[in-house]
UniProtKB/Swiss-Prot annotation:
It comes from Schizosaccharomyces pombe (strain 972 / ATCC 24843) (Fission yeast). This is Sensitive to high expression protein 9 homolog, mitochondrial. The keyword Membrane applies. Required for the maintenance of the structure of the mitochondrial inner membrane. Involved in mitochondrial morphology. Causes growth arrest when highly overexpressed. Belongs to the SHE9 family.
Length: 317
């Protein structure tokens, strides 16, 4: 197993440089393509072309200068060669009376070479003139390329600066609009929602407290009502239900629900509708009457307390 692991590690180590070079090459190619695309979008590709033209013109000027230097060197050599030949001819002419056969042959050869030396000097002079004209033209072309590149760079920088200025103003406008929207629309809605939620929460807590108090009061009243009813039942005469007419309907008093405020109001409405109905005859005992009076008293007090409490909450808001 260790041998397989070591072989796998060695294989990965051998493949890692290839993987790295491949990944690095793809990343560099992607960056280069993205850079070229950005230059095309911003118009910088034309400036890159002018830069390349300037570099080519500099290379051309350098080559022409080398050619001109070589032409001047050949011209100087041709002039020196002709001058040397003329000096030797002059020396031979000065001692013409004592020429030998060798001197005569030398003079003849120098006289013939003088024509070719003159032709070489003229040709070298022409080459120098041509090379200097080429150098001058290349130098003028280089100056024009540099000026054109400088002009295009200035135009491009002005465009970028203008676009940057408009972009900055656009971002500032968006920020101002967002600030106005947030401060004038979103924040008031958020505050209203928070206030509404807080008020609803407080109202629910108040309602729960009122319901708890109503339940406690209802329990106490039920206990007191039962005690009062038992006492009145013991001291009051008994009513015979048989003396009532047979066609009369006896009304059984509905109970009042004190669980919640809404249930209390509903049960009170139902009780009043039954109590004020003309189709029923009410038969009450002293106990029921006392309980009823107690419930009405307590119910009225609870209603008054509730309304006062609600008005107090309204004024606090």
């Amino acid at each position: 197993m260790l041998q397989r692991l070591s072989q796998s590690i060695k294989g990965f180590a051998a493949r890692f440089p290839k993987i790295y070079n491949k990944g690095n090459g793809s990343v560099q190619q992607t960056i280069l393509q993205a850079s070229q695309r950005l230059n095309e979008l911003t118009g910088y590709s034309s400036i890159e072309a002018l830069k390349n033209a300037v570099v080519k013109q500099e290379t051309k000027l350098r080559d022409f200068r080398l050619s001109a230097a070589e032409a001047r060197k050949r011209y100087i050599e041709a002039v020196e060669k002709r001058s040397s030949s003329q000096r030797e001819v002059n020396e031979l002419l000065q001692r013409r009376s004592s020429w030998s056969t060798i001197d005569l042959e030398r003079f003849t050869k120098l006289y013939r070479d003088d024509y070719s030396n003159k032709e070489e000097e003229i040709k070298a002079q022409e080459d120098v003139d041509v090379a200097e004209r080429r150098v001058e033209e290349a130098q003028n072309g280089l100056v024009r390329s540099i000026l054109s590149r400088y002009h295009e760079e200035q135009v491009w920088s002005d465009k970028i600066r203008q676009a940057s200025t408009w972009g900055t103003w656009g971002l500032m406008g968006i920020n101002v609009v967002l600030f106005v929207v947030v401060q004038l629309i979103l924040e008031p809605r958020k505050r209203k929602r928070l206030v509404r939620e807080a008020v609803d929460h407080i109202d629910k807590e108040r309602e729960l407290e009122i319901n708890d108090e109503l339940k406690k009061i209802s329990e106490k009243l039920d206990k007191k009502g039962e005690a009062v009813g038992q006492a009145l039942e013991l001291t009051s005469p008994k009513i015979d239900n048989k003396n009532l007419p047979k066609n009369s309907a006896s009304l059984i008093l509905p109970p009042i629900n004190y669980d919640t405020f809404h249930s209390f109001l509903d049960s009170l409405k139902y009780f009043l509708s039954r109590f004020l109905s003309t189709d029923y005859r009410i038969q009450l005992t002293y106990r029921q009457l006392s309980i009823l009076a107690t419930k009405f008293t307590v119910g009225g007090g609870v209603i008054i307390y509730t309304f006062i409490h609600l008005f107090g909450l309204a004024f606090k808001r």
